[in-house]
């Protein structure tokens, strides 16, 4: 465009048209002027071809009185038609770049200076940035088109000019004297390459300073994945198995890599930060963060893997937002392939999401590529985030860990442990989860729908509701090397084989998953909705008068302050009255007024929904609730007997609720809780004997409500054991027992009006049966039928009668005894 007078004329007209809209400024003109030798020829090097960039540089040079890039320049006998060149070739319309040789202008300049010792040329790398620094831009639409590390095409450049042109900045780097490079006497080709390398460093350093570091790894990683020995072997195996050429199998591996890899860009992170800042403060009443300082302390020098609990689709974005706001690098996030949809998938990918298929079975090549991708992230120190629960919890409980990602992480660490790995549990608590109504349908028995990010958009119509606050607590970090030292001493010296899959991998991974789940529960953020749900769902009519509810909430707060669950658990501010006011403001409580005051209750829809929020903190109250349960049927008990019964039930409660204490710690914790119950007047103590208050007293009502927090869990335990005992030895398989438990629970929920669909959740029964097997109480025979130890009868009758009412035990036994008989209508 600038190589002839006519082209310069056209270029000038284009520049004038451009500046009808564009406004630009030079950032460091004075420093450039001080270092520029006006007696020497000047050439401007631009990073990549762009007519608009050139027009802006020409405008700024004219304004500053600097040599214009579009005018001819003489270097000794060499006459160049213009004083600029592009360091890299022009991308096509799709943004793809063809690697070619050095710029012809640079080739000619090096040759001319090499032949004429008295000549020199100053090359000024110059960069044009469209829009403000991403760190200071506040418009989400402008951020989408701000400069980034990605290669851009013409269409994106045009949109950048239109949207960002009025905030354009030009930055000149210090001049590079070509004579200094030529005098190294490296020869023509090496000198040209050296000049290119110096300029690339200039451009990279400047871009890093202006828009942040290049943390987009897709272009670097995907091509490198197929060169790993393990992936190459998988490609060869694929070619042989499918009878296809190696090149076709390699292309398949590259396709998998592109499907998986994130396309992390700083600009997208800033865009999401702007949007989410509005979201958290418009939809929610902000985000409260606790214990992030410990993460800031361990992040340097460690590979950090964030393992949050999973309650909502917005969990994906929340953690990245918080880390970015607190000066920590946002992680690369494992996301289901179902979220890789048009527009949304691209934005998530640029925000750090990498996508994984639901199952790797039957596809060893995909498995190898995915494993290598994660290994590369780990060894290069990129922070990573994944959910050990797999999917979102629909019940509010901590789900049983899915160990797939943990196993991949563990194998990667065994392969290379140079970078220490630290797991950081992150508890995310919502006072009202966005997908609550969707979960409500599933809790009521609707089939679980396929996960989709569009679940969020389905609740837009409900955004007029108050959603309260979001709480994010960072839990106690788990250092993987230290964990392995405890579980498998000497693991560093063991022969692990080419696949890094030792015999102890599965068992150790399971324990790691359980440890992560316990640390997540330790970091629970207890909020007003949790406590109100816990209190009202423990009543027979889902209702209390305001003063009674206030007393219950004050009791719970006092107990938790006296015996904190863990140092990472947080409590709500205020007293019981303040908690009620807060929950009423969220329309989660109904009220009825009369002359005696207000009655607060849960309507039918909210009663089911509130089980979700109760379950968030059920583990916190499991042990005090269990202790209180012993006094519903016994007026007094000795400390020794209490300890014996708690120890009998604790393995099953711990397995279901991921309680934090080891069996060795249990006695000390029991004593702490007994002391707290005594101090609050719920028990009396005489030497080694504990006694309940009078049944007609207010304290006994409070003790009863506390006991009912754990009653449904104990009922499920008793159902399973009663069915086994009534069926006899070696008559039921684990699957048959599970199905019978579900049917029995459904019937009992009708008979006793239990408005909690999770009561008959088959996964809870399945896990209880598995725990009985692990504890040696059950043992499958060769046909898979379950035999049981004498301890089962002791557990069912000796312990259960201490914690469940006679009416409940009788009802369960009757249903178990007559399970094969036609059932009568419960109304008759």
Curated annotation (Swiss-Prot):
Class of this enzyme: transferase
GO MF, one annotated term: glycerol-3-phosphate O-acyltransferase activity
UniProt keyword terms in alphabetical order: Acyltransferase, Cell inner membrane, Cell membrane, Lipid biosynthesis, Lipid metabolism, Membrane, Phospholipid biosynthesis, Phospholipid metabolism, Transferase
A biological process from GO: CDP-diacylglycerol biosynthetic process
Name of one Pfam family that matches: Acyltransferase
Its EC number(s): 2.3.1.15
InterPro entries: GPAT/DHAPAT, GPAT/DHAPAT_C, GPAT/DHAPAT_LPLAT, GPAT_PlsB, Plipid/glycerol_acylTrfase
Its membrane topology: Peripheral membrane protein
Catalytic activity as recorded in UniProt: sn-glycerol 3-phosphate + an acyl-CoA = a 1-acyl-sn-glycero-3-phosphate + CoA
Pathway: Phospholipid metabolism; CDP-diacylglycerol biosynthesis; CDP-diacylglycerol from sn-glycerol 3-phosphate: step 1/3
Localization in the cell: Cell inner membrane
Residue interval(s) of motif HXXXXD motif: 309-314
HAMAP family hit by this protein: Glyc3P_acyltrans (MF_00393)
The record's note on its domains: The HXXXXD motif is essential for acyltransferase activity and may constitute the binding site for the phosphate moiety of the glycerol-3-phosphate.
Name this polypeptide is given: Glycerol-3-phosphate acyltransferase
Lineage: Bacteria, Pseudomonadati, Pseudomonadota, Gammaproteobacteria, Pseudomonadales
């Amino acid at each position: 465009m600038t190589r002839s007078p006519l082209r310069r004329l056209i270029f000038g007209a284009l520049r004038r048209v451009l500046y009808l809209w564009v406004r630009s400024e030079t950032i460091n003109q004075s420093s450039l002027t001080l270092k520029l030798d006006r007696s020497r020829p000047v050439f401007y090097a631009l990073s990549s071809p762009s007519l608009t960039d050139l027009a802006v540089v020409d405008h700024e040079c004219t304004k500053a009185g600097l040599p214009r890039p579009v005018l001819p320049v003489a270097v000794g006998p060499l006459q160049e038609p213009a004083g600029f060149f592009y360091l890299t070739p022009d991308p096509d319309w799709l943004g793809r770049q063809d690697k070619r040789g050095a710029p012809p202008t640079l080739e000619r300049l090096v040759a001319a200076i090499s032949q004429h010792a008295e000549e020199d040329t100053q090359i000024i790398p110059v960069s044009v940035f469209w829009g403000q620094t991403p760190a200071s831009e506040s418009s989400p639409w402008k951020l989408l088109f701000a400069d980034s590390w990605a290669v851009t095409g013409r269409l994106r450049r045009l949109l950048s000019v239109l949207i960002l042109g009025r905030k354009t900045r030009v930055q000149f780097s210090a001049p590079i004297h070509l004579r200094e490079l030529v005098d190294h006497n490296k020869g023509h080709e090496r000198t040209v390459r050296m000049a290119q390398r110096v300029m690339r460093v200039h451009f990279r350093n400047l871009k890093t300073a202006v828009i942040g570091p290049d943390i987009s790894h897709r272009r670097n990683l995907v091509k490198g994945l197929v060169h790993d020995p393990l992936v190459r072997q998988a490609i060869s195996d694929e070619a042989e198995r499918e009878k296809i050429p190696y090149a076709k199998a390699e292309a398949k591996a590259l396709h998998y890599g592109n499907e998986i890899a994130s396309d992390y860009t700083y600009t997208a992170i800033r865009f999401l930060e702007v949007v989410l800042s509005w979201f958290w403060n418009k939809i929610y009443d902000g985000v409260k963060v606790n214990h992030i300082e410990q993460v800031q302390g361990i992040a340097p020098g460690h590979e950090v893997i964030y393992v949050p609990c999973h309650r909502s689709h917005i969990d994906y974005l929340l953690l990245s937002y918080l880390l970015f706001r607190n000066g920590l690098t946002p992680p690369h996030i494992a996301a289901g392939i179902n979220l890789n949809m048009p527009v949304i998938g691209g934005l998530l990918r640029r925000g750090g999401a990498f996508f994984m298929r639901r199952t790797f079975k039957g596809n060893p090549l995909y498995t190898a590529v995915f494993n290598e991708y994660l290994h590369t992230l780990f060894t290069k120190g990129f922070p990573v985030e994944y959910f050990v629960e797999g999917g979102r919890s629909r019940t509010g409980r901590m789900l049983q860990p899915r160990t797939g990602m943990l196993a991949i992480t563990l194998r990667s660490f065994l392969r290379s442990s140079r970078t220490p790995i630290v797991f950081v549990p992150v508890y995310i608590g919502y006072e009202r989860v966005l997908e609550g109504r969707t979960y409500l349908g599933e809790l009521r028995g609707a089939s679980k729908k396929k996960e989709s990010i569009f679940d969020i958009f389905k609740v837009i119509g409900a955004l007029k509701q108050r959603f309260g606050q979001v709480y994010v607590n960072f839990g106690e970090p788990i250092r993987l090397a230290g964990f392995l030292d405890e579980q498998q001493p000497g693991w560093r010296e063991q022969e692990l084989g080419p696949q890094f899959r030792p015999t102890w991998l599965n068992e150790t991974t399971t324990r790691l998953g359980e440890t992560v789940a316990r640390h997540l529960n330790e970091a629970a953020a207890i909020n007003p909705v949790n406590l109100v749900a816990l209190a009202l769902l423990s009543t027979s009519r889902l209702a209390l008068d305001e003063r009674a509810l206030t007393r219950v909430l004050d009791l719970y707060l006092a107990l938790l302050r006296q015996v904190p669950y863990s140092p990472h658990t947080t409590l709500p501010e205020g007293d019981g009255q303040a908690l009620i006011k807060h929950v009423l403001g969220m329309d989660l409580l109904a009220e009825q007024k009369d002359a005696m005051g207000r009655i607060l209750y849960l309507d039918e829809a909210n009663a089911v929904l509130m089980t979700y929020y109760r379950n968030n903190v059920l583990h916190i109250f499991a042990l005090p609730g269990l202790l209180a349960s012993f006094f519903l049927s016994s007026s007094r008990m000795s400390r020794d007997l209490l300890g014996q019964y708690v120890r009998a039930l604790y393995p099953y409660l711990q397995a279901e609720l991921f309680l934090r204490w080891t069996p060795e710690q249990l006695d000390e914790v029991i004593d702490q809780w007994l002391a707290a119950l005594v101090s609050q007047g719920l028990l009396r103590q005489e030497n080694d004997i504990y006694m309940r208050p009078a049944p007609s007293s207010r304290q006994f009502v409070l003790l009863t409500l506390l006991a009912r927090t754990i009653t449904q869990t104990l009922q499920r335990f008793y159902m399973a054991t009663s069915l086994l005992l009534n069926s006899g030895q070696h008559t039921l398989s684990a699957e048959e027992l599970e199905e019978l438990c579900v049917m029995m629970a459904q019937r009992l929920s009708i008979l006793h009006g239990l408005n909690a669909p999770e009561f008959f959740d088959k996964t809870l029964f399945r896990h209880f049966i598995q725990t009985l097997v692990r504890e040696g109480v059950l043992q499958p025979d060769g046909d898979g039928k379950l035999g049981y130890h004498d301890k089962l009868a002791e557990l069912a009758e000796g312990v259960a009668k201490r914690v469940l009412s006679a009416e409940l035990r009788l009802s369960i036994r009757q249903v178990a005894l007559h399970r094969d008989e036609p059932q009568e209508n419960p109304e008759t």
